[in-house]
Swiss-Prot record:
Role, per record: Catalyzes the decarboxylation of orotidine 5'-monophosphate (OMP) to uridine 5'-monophosphate (UMP).
Enzyme class: lyase
GO biological process: 'de novo' pyrimidine nucleobase biosynthetic process; 'de novo' UMP biosynthetic process
This protein's name: Orotidine 5'-phosphate decarboxylase
InterPro entries reported in the protein's UniProt record: Aldolase_TIM (IPR013785), OMPdecase (IPR014732), OMPdecase_AS (IPR018089), OMPdecase_bac (IPR047596), OMPdeCOase_dom (IPR001754), RibuloseP-bd_barrel (IPR011060)
Family indicated by similarity: Belongs to the OMP decarboxylase family. Type 1 subfamily.
Residues annotated as transmembrane: none
Disulfide bonds: none
Highest classification ranks of the organism: Bacteria, Bacillati, Cyanobacteriota, Cyanophyceae, Synechococcales
HAMAP family (UniProt xref): OMPdecase_type1_B
Cleavable signal peptide: none
Positions contributing to substrate binding: 16, 37, 64-73, 128, 190, 199, 219-220
The UniProt record lists the keyword Cell membrane: no
Functional pathway: Pyrimidine metabolism; UMP biosynthesis via de novo pathway; UMP from orotate: step 2/2
Length: 245
């Protein structure tokens, strides 16, 4: 039987807006953190070497590059990304069934070639900065946002992926359709009192987990806090209290 995840295992700290040295210095002050997210900005500025640096600190990596291209290109990118040791890697669900299936197979091959465990690929559904009105007006998508996310998550599951990325607003409906171990990783997490910034579909850590989220991605409320360690501890406490209720 799988042991329940600890609060630290359920929180992924997004190292967005940081250079390599800043990211490494920041995370070294948070020894309780287990997971970090490396996104496009940090990866483009620092390269794959930053992943090795973070792994040396014992951290697990959510490599959030949101690959979206033709199947062969996505597969090649996922093969290389898996060889860097990331545990979670994102691809856009809109890339389609062939691209998702080939990406999953390539990631397994890339990890095996360097003696690593296969990563879990996550399909990005609809970004948390989008709302229903923009989806219709800018992309001409007539589906409701919930229906769109559920359709893309089903595509990911049918393609053999291990989970998807969605806002916390869609988690409850998705969890009914896709029981664990299908992972639902949710950005748009805002503890009580935190600013929304450019996120639209947001929720508190406890509420998102109660809805069925597997892991939570949280950035600015911790990385820009006056005391990041204390902010992280507060999030963990909120999760612990939820587990006791």
């Amino acid at each position: 039987m799988t042991s329940p995840l600890t609060p630290a295992d359920q929180l992924i700290i997004a190292l967005d807006g940081m250079e390599r040295a800043e990211a490494l210095a920041f995370i070294s002050k948070l020894p309780e953190v287990s997971w970090v997210k490396v996104g496009l900005e940090l990866f483009v500025s620092a390269g794959p070497e930053v992943l090795a640096d973070l792994r040396e600190q014992g951290l697990q990596i959510f490599l959030d590059l949101k690959f979206h291209d033709i199947p062969a290109t996505i597969a090649g990118a996922c093969r290389r990304a898996a060889s860097f040791g990331a545990e979670l890697i994102t691809v856009h669900a809109c890339a389609g069934r062939a691209a998702l299936a080939e990406a999953q197979a390539a990631a397994c091959e890339g990890a095996a070639e360097v003696g690593l465990s296969a990563p879990r690929l996550l399909a990005v559904t609809v970004l948390t900065s989008w709302d229903q009105k923009r989806l219709a007006n800018e992309l001409c998508i007539p589906q409701s946002l919930q229906a769109r996310v559920e359709w893309l998550a089903e595509l990911a599951a049918e393609s053999g992926l291990g989970g998807c990325v969605c806002s916390p607003w869609e988690v409850s409906g998705l969890r009914r359709l896709h029981p664990s171990p299908f992972e639902l990783v949710t950005p748009g997490i805002r503890p009580s009192g935190a600013e929304l910034a450019d996120q639209v579909r947001v929720m508190s850590p406890a509420a998102a987990l109660n809805a069925g989220a597997s892991r939570l991605v949280i950035g600015r409320p911790i990385t820009r806090a006056v005391d990041p360690a204390e902010a992280f501890a507060r999030c963990c406490l909120e999760i612990e209290q939820r587990q006791l209720d």
